[in-house]
């Protein structure tokens, strides 16, 4: 009995001894979780280093991972303690005191300088300064007082930023990585900032080079900070990026890079705004209080159409220019993504968003694309795959241009637009092609479409005339009789192949529309009527010689063919049926060559390439891959060749990289997407190109508010644009043209003529001027645009949306006859 009791006591003691470390672990784990919870409260916080270490399964990295975990655990504890000190009973004496720009500069070393600007480095604080000599303005790559900032972020708790958030804001770079393990297959949900990396600085005569070693993520890269005459050029070459383990079994790959995400960040006391490239352009005021909304995040040049979304993508305007700006008072910083711009996202956020206290805008580069699909039809089993075989883009780069007003007044939106226009002139070859005293009415005409028809009870899919060549001529005659002196016509779907949605590269007018003789007659109709026979070879319903769907369809990252889905308007899911094949960009060169040969042989002087000017795609085939960057260069080469052989190169919308090579651009938006975080729209795109490229608005009759679209077009210096068809709406029903239900010419020719005559009298005199100032009244109803030209007096045009008038100098134009239904307040 005694022995049994003794044995029970020993067993109990052993069990208790074994449980004690477990209890300690539970307490430790709870503390660590609390610390990590505080860290994750900050936006875009990195994964905990313990997780990172656990994720790194390589035995060779075990010691590094363990060391990183220990360091990060200690850091998390310090952060938690610092946060507790910051947000509870810390006295004023214990708080970090703010410093001035001059005091911050005293901690820096001058690296290099030009006649206009100087570059300084504060290596200890991982911070650079761009100093503008003329204005004395300091631009810091991260806020100098981030540690002292006591702005209340959590209004419920009355607390300021967490310490982890402060460290992220002070970082000079950030990355995201893709986890290739089969059970993960995800991208890091938030950036990993450079405060989690080992950073080494090297100085040279042009600037500095920073090496960022993300040990736990297995990524090492170099970022160059080069001072040029009027800008700071920050770039990273892909051949200087090292990825330690890219194994598809247990590796990690670099997927995104951010340079200086808080360059020029403005604190909660600052007044100013940011410009984002959404649609026509939009303004985000500093500290606008929209903290509950998502920050601005948009892919420049639109999404990659090779990846086919599982559900319908949201309907937004496109960002056509890789440019951002932040402005305070008489100074601003214009940021241009100059390298790798085909794979960049524009970001902006205001104080209070994501639990941080600054207003900032920045670019995020995508180094690898990804794609998602579901296995076995199970919508819960989503698989993500990342682009293989290295980083295809050679360089990622941003240029930061400081700009100041000449007279000390507040910087205008047009001043920032001028910076980007000069960049296009000096770096991309943009030249002035706009004609003086010229105003055109832009009209899109649609030739033919396939339509299901029953003959003797047997269904046939037949070519159907929508606007034949003679009918197009009749529409133009009506417009001319109404007083329209100059017309630019974009004629769509006028060959048999284009009507059938096949690749069409030969000038072969469809007999269904009237044949070659009627086509030739239309083309040569009137010297003041510019007819552009366009071909859109972006996708195809079926193959043709040289462009078979089996060999000429773009391949997705997932190794599937890229078929462009149509989506249910009600549910947003892909509709069943045959989806058009996306033409591989490897065939674009053939398309450009064949079209140009055929157009020049037929002595046509105008050409258009449809979606090539606005949509960028990739091809991830193993044999001949094409990244978005390579596709962009192919498109640029094609448009450049066209500009050398054809006098009129027409763009149906235009990303910035084609602007140097086109003479006319239609479908220039007058709105942004209206993201909640933005405050109002501006015609930033128009400010960049006015006086250099002729352009027209989106179709007036397509807009849900045609009156406002007309007035905004006038205020932004845009020509008027209409969609027109000869056939009635019932003919368009159940065809690819059913969304043109509004376009029958009979209902629009009178209004179009009236609007053209009014716009021509107001704008033709400034057609070759640049926009040098744009102002909005407090209620946003009066829009005032200043046009300037060397050797001429400025012309100021004000458009009053509420009263439907336009004022040029002292002359007031009544726009009542240009308004279809009147405007409401």
What do these predicted regions represent?
Residues 13-21:
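Bacterial N-terminal signal peptides
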Residues 20-41:
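Sec-dependent signal peptide cleavage junction
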Residues 486-495, 530-537, 597-621:
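Short acidic catalytic loops
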Residues 2-12:
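Bacterial N-terminal signal peptides that target proteins for export
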Residues 114-133, 316-318, 326-360, 366, ...:
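Active-site-proximal substrate-binding groove within the catalytic cores of carbohydrate-active enzymes
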Residues 86-433, 701, 705, 819:
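N-terminal accessory beta-strand-rich subdomains and adjacent acidic, glycine-rich linkers
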Residues 436-524, 528-588:
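Aromatic-lined carbohydrate-binding/catalytic grooves of carbohydrate-active enzymes
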Residues 48-82:
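Long, acidic low-complexity intrinsically disordered regions
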């Amino acid at each position: 009995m005694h022995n049994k009791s003794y044995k029970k006591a020993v067993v109990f003691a052993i069990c208790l001894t074994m449980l004690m470390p477990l209890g300690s672990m539970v307490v430790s784990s709870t503390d660590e979780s609390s610390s990590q919870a505080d860290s994750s409260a900050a936006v875009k916080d990195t994964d905990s280093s313990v997780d990172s270490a656990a994720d790194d399964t390589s035995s060779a990295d075990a010691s590094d991972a363990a060391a990183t975990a220990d360091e990060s655990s200690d850091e998390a504890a310090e952060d938690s303690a610092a946060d507790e000190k910051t947000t509870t009973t810390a006295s004023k004496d214990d708080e970090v005191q703010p410093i001035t720009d001059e005091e911050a500069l005293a901690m820096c070393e001058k690296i290099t300088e030009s006649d206009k600007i100087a570059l300084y480095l504060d290596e200890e604080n991982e911070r650079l300064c761009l100093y503008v000599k003329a204005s004395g303005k300091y631009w810091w790559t991260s806020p100098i007082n981030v540690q002292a900032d006591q702005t209340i972020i959590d209004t419920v708790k009355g607390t300021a930023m967490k310490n982890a958030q402060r460290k992220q804001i002070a970082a000079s770079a950030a990355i995201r990585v893709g986890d290739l393990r089969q059970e993960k297959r995800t991208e890091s949900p938030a950036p990993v900032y450079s405060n989690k990396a080992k950073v080494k600085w090297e100085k040279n005569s042009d600037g500095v080079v920073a090496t960022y070693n993300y040990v736990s993520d297995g990524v090492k890269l170099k970022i160059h900070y080069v001072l040029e005459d009027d800008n700071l050029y920050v770039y990273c070459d892909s051949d200087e990026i090292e990825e330690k383990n890219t194994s598809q079994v247990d590796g990690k790959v670099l997927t995104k890079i951010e340079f200086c995400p808080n360059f020029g960040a403005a604190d909660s006391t600052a007044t100013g705004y940011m410009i984002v490239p959404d649609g026509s352009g939009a303004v985000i005021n500093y500290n606008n209080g929209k903290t509950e909304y998502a920050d601005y995040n948009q892919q420049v040049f639109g999404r990659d159409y090779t990846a086919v979304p599982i559900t319908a993508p949201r309907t937004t305007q496109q960002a056509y220019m890789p440019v951002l700006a932040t402005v305070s008072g008489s100074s601003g910083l214009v940021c241009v993504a100059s390298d790798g711009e085909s794979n960049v996202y524009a970001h902006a956020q205001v104080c209070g968003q994501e639990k941080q206290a600054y207003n900032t805008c920045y670019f995020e580069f995508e180094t690898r694309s990804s794609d998602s699909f579901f296995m076995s039809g199970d919508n819960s089993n989503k698989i993500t795959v990342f682009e293989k075989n290295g980083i295809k883009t050679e360089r990622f780069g941003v240029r930061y241009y400081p700009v100041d007003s000449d007279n000390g007044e507040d910087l205008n939106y047009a001043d920032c637009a001028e910076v980007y226009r000069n960049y296009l002139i000096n770096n991309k070859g943009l030249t002035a092609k706009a004609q003086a005293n010229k105003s055109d009415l832009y009209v899109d005409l649609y030739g033919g479409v396939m339509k299901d028809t029953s003959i003797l009870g047997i269904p046939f899919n037949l070519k159907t005339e929508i606007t034949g060549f003679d009918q197009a001529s009749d529409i133009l005659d009506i417009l001319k009789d109404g007083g329209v002196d100059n017309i630019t016509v974009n004629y769509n779907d006028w060959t048999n192949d284009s009507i059938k949605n096949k690749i069409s590269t030969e000038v072969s007018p469809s007999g269904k529309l009237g044949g070659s003789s009627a086509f030739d007659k239309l083309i040569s109709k009137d010297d003041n009527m510019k007819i552009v026979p366009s071909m859109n070879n972006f996708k195809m319903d079926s193959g043709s010689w040289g462009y078979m769907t089996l060999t000429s369809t773009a391949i997705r990252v997932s190794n599937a063919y890229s078929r462009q889905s149509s989506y249910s308007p009600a549910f947003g899911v892909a509709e069943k049926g045959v989806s058009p094949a996306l033409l591989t960009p490897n065939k674009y060169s053939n398309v450009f060559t064949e079209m140009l040969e055929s157009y020049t042989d037929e002595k046509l002087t105008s050409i258009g390439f449809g979606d090539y000017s606005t949509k960028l795609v990739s091809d991830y085939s193993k044999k001949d891959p094409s990244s978005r960057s390579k596709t962009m260069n192919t498109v640029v080469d094609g448009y450049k060749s066209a500009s050398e052989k054809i006098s009129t190169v027409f763009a149906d919308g235009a990303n910035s990289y084609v602007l140097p090579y086109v003479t006319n651009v239609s479908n220039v938006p007058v709105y942004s997407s209206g993201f909640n975080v933005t405050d109002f729209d501006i015609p930033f795109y128009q400010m960049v190109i006015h006086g250099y490229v002729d352009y027209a608005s989106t179709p007036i009759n397509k807009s849900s508010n045609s009156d406002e679209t007309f007035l905004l077009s006038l205020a932004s210096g845009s020509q008027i644009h209409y969609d027109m068809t000869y056939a009635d709406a019932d003919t368009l029903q159940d065809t690819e043209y059913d969304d043109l239900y509004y376009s029958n010419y009979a209902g629009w020719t009178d209004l179009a003529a009236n609007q053209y005559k009014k716009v021509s009298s107001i704008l033709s005199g400034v057609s070759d001027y640049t926009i040098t100032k744009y102002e909005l009244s407090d209620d946003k109803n009066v829009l005032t645009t200043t046009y300037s030209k060397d050797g001429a007096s400025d012309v100021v045009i004000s458009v009053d949306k509420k009263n439907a008038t336009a004022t040029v100098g002292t002359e007031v134009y009544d726009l009542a006859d240009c308004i279809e239904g009147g405007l409401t307040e």
